[in-house]
From Swiss-Prot:
Pfam families: PRK. Its EC number is 2.7.1.33. ATP binds at residues 90-97. InterPro entries: P-loop_NTPase, PanK, PRK/URK. This is Pantothenate kinase. Keywords: ATP-binding, Coenzyme A biosynthesis, Cytoplasm, Kinase, Nucleotide-binding, Transferase. GO terms for cellular component: cytoplasm. It catalyses: (R)-pantothenate + ATP = (R)-4'-phosphopantothenate + ADP + H(+). GO terms for molecular function: ATP binding; pantothenate kinase activity.
Amino acid sequence: MNDYNHYFHFPREEWRKLEVSKDQILTAEELEEIRGLNDRISLQDISEIYLPLIKLIAIQYHEAIFIHGEKMEYLKKKESRAPFIIALAGSVAVGKSTTARVFKLMLDRWFSKTRQVELVTTDGFLYPNKVLEERGIMDKKGFPESYDRDRFAKFLTDLKANKEDVEIPLYSHFTYDVLDETRVIHNPDIVIIEGINVLQADQHESLFPSDFFDFSVYMDANEADIKKWYLERFFMLRETAFQDESSYFHPYTKISKQEAETFALGVWDTINGVNLKENIEKTKYRADLVLQKGTDHLISDIYLRK
């Protein structure tokens, strides 16, 4: 299905002409620090795509604050507005993590650090490997059933209930498992939630995660390109992080390149690719905005819900 009927379509050349009052707010050095492995996001993307997008998010943030203030004044209540939540979804290897870090840094700069912006990934809400193994779904890691949805729902509810301190479980891509420790965020103004599953809906639940979001973004690309980027990233990690003997994937540095490629292709064809087609891709039209990437990693088209 290709249903963009309820979206405005902005080709890159049209989007980049949107007026933004602020100058470039990231340097090349800062971008290099937050860029993910094999993610070729450039300063050109920052100025032409992300700066207009950050302005749009800022407009919606201020509108939400204004409406809340008007409502509280009318109701004669005194309660601060719950955090403004931005959701960022998309496939493995499409560039979500880098984009989420770009959002955080640019929002910090846009508001001159007068707003507390927090970044949360949904990886921490996966069940620990031990639980996945006990349930026989280790090969479904990343699928909806591999997430502790009750814990994620409580996290979102706590945020929207204006709870002062909200606990976030942490995940290590090094050990490929949920960590024992957690992180606490205190009274955030804006929260960016990044993960493959953030726009997924469970028909058996009374609340969907999207019920809590103020703005949602889906990062899209052709599956063949995403698969290629996934394989490239796997081999980059094989030469770097996987070399550490403590890494979960260290054994794959001891086999031949051809064997490693067979393994990585198998993971894509039986797990990541299947999850993309069955669960992730269908959430695209729930997003407020879709960023379409081309083969060269550059954003080619933007779709904004009307």
